[in-house]
């Protein structure tokens, strides 16, 4: 099975280990990975900031780059959601709307692909300790991926998963929201960190690097002893 990887901006610039883990897990599951070097940003930051025409140019480039893929997989629920929004963005342009739909139909978030397409629930990972899961907004509310991360983590040997209080609450990142509405964002992430600490977890695990960088940065500034990990890193662990 051929998988074309969209690594995302944050993985490319800040969390390259997440990209490596994503590839290694998928290859271990029998996938052949392709990485088009022409890939750029999915256009979400520009689109959410109101720069629609600039965003469309990036989106058209991404459609051209990925439309011949068999499956498109990304370690980000937020970016996968943006791919699924492409047909709506181009709703007044039938030609591009059709091409956008073709791309959207074969785009999956990393854990969604493993559980729903590969039909795998245990990847053979092991990581001793206690974890809690942050469920990112776009991934759960818009993409509809709610159970896949928990299913996979429940089968990681040695790992105990505890429910995160107020799990439905946003961490305050929201892309450019954290820059434009900083005081509100800071209050939101403080509340998220309080919830994490309440669980007594050794690890905070999530599927979106934006959320994890936001929460992890706050945890570090507050001097808390919790390790933040992307789920791809956890599923690639053999401790």
Curated annotation (Swiss-Prot):
Signal peptide: none annotated. One of its GO terms (biological process) is lactate metabolic process. It comes from the Bacteria. GO terms for molecular function: oxidoreductase activity. GO terms for cellular component: cytosol. Is involved in L-lactate degradation and allows cells to grow with lactate as the sole carbon source. Belongs to the LutA/YkgE family. This is Lactate utilization protein A. It comes from Bacillus cereus (strain ATCC 14579 / DSM 31 / CCUG 7414 / JCM 2152 / NBRC 15305 / NCIMB 9373 / NCTC 2599 / NRRL B-3711). The lineage of its organism: Bacteria, Bacillati, Bacillota, Bacilli, Bacillales. The gene is lutA.
């Amino acid at each position: 099975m051929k998988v074309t990887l969209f690594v995302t901006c944050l993985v490319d610039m800040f969390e390259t280990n997440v990209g490596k883990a994503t590839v290694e897990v998928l290859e271990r599951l029998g996938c052949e990975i392709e990485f088009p070097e022409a890939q750029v940003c999915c256009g979400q930051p520009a689109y959410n900031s109101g720069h629609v025409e600039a965003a469309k140019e990036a989106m058209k480039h991404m459609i051209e780059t990925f439309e011949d893929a068999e499956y498109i997989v990304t370690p980000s629920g937020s970016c996968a959601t943006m791919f699924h929004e492409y047909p709506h963005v181009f709703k007044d342009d039938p030609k591009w709307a059709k091409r956008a739909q073709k791309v959207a139909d074969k785009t999956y978030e990393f854990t969604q692909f493993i559980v729903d397409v590969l039909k795998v629930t245990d990847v053979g990972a092991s990581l001793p300790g206690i974890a809690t899961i942050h469920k990112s907004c776009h991934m759960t509310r818009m993409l509809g991926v709610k159970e896949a991360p928990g299913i996979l983590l429940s089968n990681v040997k040695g790992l105990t998963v505890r429910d995160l209080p107020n799990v439905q609450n946003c961490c305050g990142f929201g892309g450019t929201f954290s820059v434009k509405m900083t005081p509100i964002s800071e209050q939101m992430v403080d509340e998220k960190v309080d919830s994490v600490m309440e669980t007594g977890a050794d690890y905070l695990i999530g599927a979106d690097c934006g959320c994890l960088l936001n929460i992890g940065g706050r945890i570090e500034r507050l001097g808390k002893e919790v390790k933040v990990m992307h789920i791809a890193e956890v599923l690639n662990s053999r401790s």
